[in-house]
């Protein structure tokens, strides 16, 4: 078994050494670069061990201006190095005084001596230069790094204390991308039943995505009843211990430190920037969305999110009633979503006005225990939920009438799923838990074992064929190494912000990625040596993109929207948007244009091509396309089942019918008396095609 990556001193040291390893050698010896550190190694063979700690630290100061190695000026014979920081006799240690001489005493008084084992000299031409980029990064990140370290060290100790106190089970849940699930999903490491569903979406510069999430092992009351969370129940709660609890869009919680004005904190695991400015606390996520928490405080002590914005001025705004109950959302297109709640703050209905008509996007119903038992969509189609004691979900019946079931061992937050299945034995799993591993058997009698550490990260999977997949993570829970059952390895190296900078695939080929100071991807080098690059403006919008062939495409913006695109030949394409930020006209370099029209929900209803031909579209209340009229008069009609699967499609000539099975798998297709059927096993894997 491969244990998780060590978090101790040895593990950290190994990770640092690996990350520092260059990729360029001369005669099998590592090269030096401008900016690389040099450490004096005493000759222990001829001299006794030093009585004081060595301070003979140096740094390569210059390298070639025309030859780069690992992206920095390559240093060679006679290039100057910063040294001479061995100043006088070490002083007697005094309380409050530094134990080491400041690096500011470094001066360029040494030269690099080149030592190679074999081979002829390698000429490195060009006048000497410093590594300007590295120097800028040092000056730019020096103060920030010290501040993060100071805050981070202090804050990590606080997090450890909070976890020992068991502040909230939601703080122990991993991000979904880091979990391994099976069935209708169950988390392999914890036995947690985990369910998500997007109830509705609205387009816009910042789309409105109303998603709900359920965790069986976190009995927390909320705006969708116990154990359920929606994506806009975002808030921060001041803790007595000098920290904040942050409620994420998926309902999980993490901790953030209290800050002084002007301070910042970066949570690498969650990819969040936390800052305190004159307006208050602000959180910035990996997408660049900025969150402010000036909303009312809810009954659980959370200061609710008041706005979600982008750097170029788009914003979602939130309105609250007394007790921090969500009352409305104003979209980035200016639409008002009305949110109705009961006295406990539970959401009853979310609606929007569409061309003068109120459309109820989703409705919820609860039982006397505060559990959500029914959801009703825009087409008045329902899902039903049944729970056992402790708010444990035991049955879900979808819009098509099919049910999924869960059985547990234990009660409440300590319950773990031991059996899950769908009607007819679909997606059936039997689960057994051991110390540090989970054994599952599916309906096809295939067995799999998952091994995990204290952090609940899966580090080994033994599949039904005996094949072993191994994963190795770093201390930030980032996946660094995957070894598949055939023994091939995939590796990923990250920068200090947790962004991948080098990906080595199973064939040993590397992809390199570079970022700017705002964490924007600026270049990508493919295994074949091709380079793609991007440039950005102050709002982090792409203003140019250069292809491997050297062609550059440029983008210009006006008022937050894309206005022109200029291709590699200098041809300009002009885009025009309406006041709701829908693209309504595209003008080509030759003067021709295409036009689009939309309804009140932002759905395309008419498209006009460069010849003036018109195509028209119509939708149902759930945004399913039900009618398409082509320029020649041919009309396509579409019908759907309660799950949103297309069951009937026709035009002026043809007609096709479809039937579906569990989870929307296609069971049959019929056209012009030709009937094709599809058969699946209990894992919904295709096994048979008949006609």
List each model region and its residues:
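A general structural signal for short secondary-structure junctions and capping/turn motifs
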Residues: 57-58, 112-114, 192, 198-205, ...
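Extended charged/polar low-complexity repeat regions
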Residues: 162, 188, 210, 216, ...
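Residue-level detector of short, conserved catalytic/binding motifs and their immediate flanks
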Residues: 22, 65, 120, 198, ...
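Intrinsically disordered, low-complexity segments enriched in small residues
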Residues: 131-208, 212-214
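Short aromatic-centered micro-motifs
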Residues: 23-25, 33, 67, 122, ...
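Short, well-ordered loop/turn elements at secondary-structure boundaries
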Residues: 18-20, 26, 61-63, 69, ...
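Intrinsically disordered, low-complexity proline/glycine-rich segments
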Residues: 1-161, 308, 315-317, 336-338, ...
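N-terminal targeting and processing segments
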Residues: 1-38, 195, 205, 212-217, ...
């Amino acid at each position: 078994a491969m244990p998780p990556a060590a978090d101790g001193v040895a593990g950290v040291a190994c990770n640092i050494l690996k990350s520092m390893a260059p990729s360029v050698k001369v005669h099998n010896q590592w090269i030096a670069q401008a900016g690389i550190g040099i450490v004096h190694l005493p000759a222990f063979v001829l001299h006794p061990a030093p009585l004081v700690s060595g301070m003979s630290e140096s740094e390569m100061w210059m390298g070639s201006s025309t030859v780069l190695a690992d992206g920095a000026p390559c240093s060679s014979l006679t290039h100057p190095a910063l040294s001479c920081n061995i100043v006088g006799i070490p002083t007697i240690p005094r309380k409050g005084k530094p134990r080491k001489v400041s690096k500011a005493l470094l001066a360029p008084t040494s030269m690099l001596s080149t030592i190679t084992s074999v081979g002829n000299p390698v000429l490195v031409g060009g006048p000497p230069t410093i590594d300007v980029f590295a120097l800028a990064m040092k000056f730019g990140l020096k103060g920030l790094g010290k501040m993060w370290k100071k805050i981070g060290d202090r804050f990590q100790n606080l997090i450890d204390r909070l976890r020992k106190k068991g502040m909230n089970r939601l703080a122990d849940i991993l991000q979904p991308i880091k979990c391994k699930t099976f069935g209708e999903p169950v988390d392999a490491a914890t036995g947690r039943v985990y369910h998500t569903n997007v109830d509705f979406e609205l387009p816009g510069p910042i789309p409105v995505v109303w998603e709900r999430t359920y965790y069986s092992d976190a009995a927390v009351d909320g705006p969708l009843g116990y154990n359920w969370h929606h994506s806009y129940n975002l808030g921060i709660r001041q803790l007595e211990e000098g920290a904040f609890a942050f409620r994420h869009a998926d309902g999980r919680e993490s901790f953030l430190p209290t800050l002084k004005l002007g301070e910042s904190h970066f949570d690498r695991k969650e990819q969040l920037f936390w800052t305190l400015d004159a307006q208050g606390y602000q959180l910035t996520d990996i997408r660049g969305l900025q969150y402010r928490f000036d909303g009312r405080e809810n009954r659980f002590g959370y200061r609710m999110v008041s706005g979600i914005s982008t750097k170029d001025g788009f914003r979602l705004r939130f309105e609250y009633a007394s007790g921090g109950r969500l009352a409305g959302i104003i979209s980035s297109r200016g639409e008002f979503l009305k949110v109705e709640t009961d006295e406990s703050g539970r959401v009853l209905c979310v609606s929007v006005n569409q061309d003068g008509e109120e459309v109820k996007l989703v409705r919820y119903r609860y039982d006397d225990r505060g559990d959500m038992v029914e959801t009703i969509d825009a087409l008045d189609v329902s899902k039903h939920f049944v729970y056992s004691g402790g708010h444990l979900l035991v049955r879900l019946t979808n819009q098509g009438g099919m049910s999924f079931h869960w059985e547990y061992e234990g009660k409440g937050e300590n319950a773990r799923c031991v059996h899950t299945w769908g009607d007819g034995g679909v997606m059936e799993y039997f689960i057994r838990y051991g110390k540090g591993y989970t054994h599952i058997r599916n309906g096809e009698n295939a067995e799999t074992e998952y091994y995990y550490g204290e952090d609940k990260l899966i580090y080994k999977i033994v599949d039904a064929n005996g094949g072993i997949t191994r994963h190795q993570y770093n201390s930030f829970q980032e996946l660094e190494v995957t070894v598949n059952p055939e023994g091939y390895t995939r590796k990923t190296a990250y920068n200090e912000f947790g962004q991948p900078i080098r990906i080595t695939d199973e064939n040993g080929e590397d992809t390199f990625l570079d970022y700017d100071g705002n964490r924007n991807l600026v270049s990508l080098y493919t295994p074949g040596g091709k380079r793609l690059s991007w440039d950005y403006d102050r709002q982090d919008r792409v203003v140019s993109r250069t292809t491997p062939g050297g062609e550059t495409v440029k983008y210009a913006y006006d008022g937050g929207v894309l206005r022109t695109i200029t291709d590699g030949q200098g041809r300009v394409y002009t885009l025009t948007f309406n006041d709701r930020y829908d693209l309504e006209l595209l003008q080509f370099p030759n003067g021709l244009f295409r036009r689009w029209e939309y309804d009140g929900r932002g759905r395309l209803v008419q498209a006009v091509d460069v010849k003036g031909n018109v195509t028209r579209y119509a939708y149902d209340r759930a945004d399913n396309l039900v009618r398409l009229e082509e320029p020649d008069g041919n009309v396509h009609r579409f019908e759907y089942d309660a799950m949103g699967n297309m069951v009937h499609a026709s035009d002026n000539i043809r007609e096709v019918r479809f039937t579906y099975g569990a989870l929307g798998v296609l069971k049959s297709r019929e056209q012009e008396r030709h009937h094709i059927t599809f058969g699946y096993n209990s894992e919904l894997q295709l096994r048979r095609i008949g006609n």
